[in-house]
Amino acid sequence: MRTLVVDHPLVAHKLTVLRDKNTPSPVFRQLTEELVTLLAYEATRDVRTEPVTIETPVSTTIGTAFTKPTPLVVPILRAGLGMLEGMTKLVPTAEVGFLGMARDEETLDIITYAERLPENLTDRQIFVLDPMLATGGTLREAIKFLFKRGASDVTCICLLAAPEGLAKLEEELSDANVTIVLASIDEKLNEKSYIVPGLGDAGDRLYGIAG
């Protein structure tokens, strides 16, 4: 597993505004989209391509195109949906799948309540969208779900991570071909498993408080 924190003034500025509790939902959504596009630029640095021959108005030349199948983008519901537009603006030909995951309040296990993905993910290059890597439980189960379908190349784009959750992922996925791309690794988790300083509940700030 590899971790990449994107160090760029625009990333730092947009993240600062996202963190501000006074930032309203419409601005929060717009900034999330913009920030994801910046992170996706780095996350797609190793996207698979092949040479293609094209005709310009002047001559024939060799260009670059995505290999087939094209990248698969998988937002984790619901907060991951707020990141989708920022990703597909950069990679508009990508296919999009969905994973709905939540923690069972009684058992505390992560359950999959919805999915719309190809049955066979062998040879697919997959980009998972999940804004907050707190305990790491949801992202870990999402990656395992994809691996069970045959995936072997997964990149996760997150806005923030707590060191505790990141360490747990590294421990369990140390040998896996997984890359985590982040805007920031924050200080810690608090007693409620919120990232500190964090930005609060990303889903609530994107869409309101409906669960």
Curated annotation (Swiss-Prot):
Entry EC number(s): 2.4.2.9
Keywords, in A-Z order: Allosteric enzyme, Glycosyltransferase, GTP-binding, Magnesium, Nucleotide-binding, Transferase
GO MF: GTP binding; magnesium ion binding; uracil phosphoribosyltransferase activity
Pathway annotation: Pyrimidine metabolism; UMP biosynthesis via salvage pathway; UMP from uracil: step 1/1
Regulation of its function: Allosterically activated by GTP.
Membership in a protein family: Belongs to the UPRTase family.
Name of the protein described by the UniProt record: Uracil phosphoribosyltransferase
Originating gene: upp
